[in-house]
Structures are given as C-alpha cells and as structure tokens.
C-alpha cells in the first residue's frame, strides 16, 4: 500500500525530474576522491520524505545525512536506502537534534558543508535561522551552500529589492547573511499531493562571518525598530533612538528624503545608517 502524506508534517513530495535536477545542479556538488577528504562535499538533507531527492544526492557518491521526523518514513527509507555506505539517516526534529554531537561517531559524514532540501513550508523561518543564524549571531562555522525548495512567497521576500511589497526585515537580514539566488519556479503539480501555493528553488551562499560588515548588534536593533510599523516613516519608528530632526539630517547624508520608510532603504543604506548613527548620538 502506498504511503500517504501526512498533513501535520507538511508533507508534499517532489516528483518532478527537471526540478530535482535543477536542485542538484544548483548545489554544485564536488565529489572528488574518497581519500581526498576535504575535497568532498558532505550533504545535509532535511525531510527526505520518500527519498526521491535523496537518491539523486547519493548518486553523486558524496556522503549524505538525512534528517526525518516521521518514524514510518524512516522505516521505509532504511529499507530502501539503508545499505548505502554514503547514507546516514537520523530520526528526529532537525530543529532540536545536535547534529555535531551525533556525527562525532560518523567522521566520514562530518563536517557537513552543504544543505540540499525540500523543507516543510510551515517551519521555513526556524530552518533559515538554524542554517544561517541571525545578524547578531551568525552560524559558525557556516555552510558553504544551501539549496532549498520553499514557498514562492518566501523566495520573493528573500530576493526582494527596496520599495517593493515583498521587501521587509527578512529581506535585509537574509541578504546581509548570504547571497540569495532564485534558481527556478516550481508549480504545484510537481508535488504529491499538490500544495495550494507556488514554490521556488533558491540558493543561499552564506558570507564568512569575518566578512560581515558593520555593527551587527546596532543593525539588528535598527531593523527591529525600523520595520516595527511599515506604514510609519523612519523618523517616527526611530524617534526613541534619535531625534527626528537629527534623523532627517542623517537621511539627507544617505540621499534619502525625510519621509523615507524602512522599506525604502537598501541593505547598503541600512549599513550606512548603522555606521553614521553613532556620530549623532550623545556620548555614553
């Protein structure tokens, strides 16, 4: 009897060969020779489901660690793929598991350096934080490449440009932490069962933490305040931090009008604001 997807786990299984190939290609998986160690990519897959994408990843010859929450699916995956030497299946919640600790006994699968996954859409935000960290606390060490199949709305927000409807704090945060590339659109019919939303494949290339510019704590604070109320102008959202007339002067230095809203500032302008703001504040 066929295994029926469970709604509570947000299960929609990808069965569209062109999309599967696009995901694997976007990861640019380097196989190298087994004895070369560091030249081989070690892959993390979140929510392998029925193992369709997993099999394509395993076909590269690279070590693949798959994390699956559904116990029944784990049983099926072990029967189907459990004999592969380059496959390690971990049962549990990826948001809770300590992967570093679990992989200490499996050195051939560690350290994981790339993520390739069709993630459950209902936990996209916490998974992004797990994989990238936050502005104040980026993930260290970071992954080299993260290829995710996500809801199209999320892809639009992650890649959005200033002064657009989709642009918000999430856009700035993710673009600060990583380069974000839109790979391909994915229609509902590519899944079983078809979701009620469109999807897209994105690739995140995290920046090394030592290359992240600016005062990360202040940038995070400004984003929280600035986007707290999208309808308000920055001079109102930030008035608890800086006097409106001072902010107007500061915005002029950024070639922005005094009526600017948070959504009008590019990542570069947010960083400029972060760098200039301390010169307008009284000494502490």
From Swiss-Prot:
Its EC number is 2.1.1.182. It is an enzyme of class 2 (transferase). It catalyses: adenosine(1518)/adenosine(1519) in 16S rRNA + 4 S-adenosyl-L-methionine = N(6)-dimethyladenosine(1518)/N(6)-dimethyladenosine(1519) in 16S rRNA + 4 S-adenosyl-L-homocysteine + 4 H(+). Keywords: Cytoplasm, Methyltransferase, RNA-binding, rRNA processing, S-adenosyl-L-methionine, Transferase. InterPro entries: KsgA/Erm, rRNA_Ade_diMease-like_C, rRNA_Ade_Mease_Trfase_CS, rRNA_Ade_methylase_Trfase_N, rRNA_adenine_dimethylase, SAM-dependent_MTases_sf. GO terms for molecular function: 16S rRNA (adenine(1518)-N(6)/adenine(1519)-N(6))-dimethyltransferase activity; RNA binding; rRNA (adenine-N6,N6-)-dimethyltransferase activity. This is Ribosomal RNA small subunit methyltransferase A. It comes from Synechocystis sp. (strain ATCC 27184 / PCC 6803 / Kazusa). The lineage of its organism: Bacteria, Bacillati, Cyanobacteriota, Cyanophyceae, Synechococcales. The gene is rsmA.
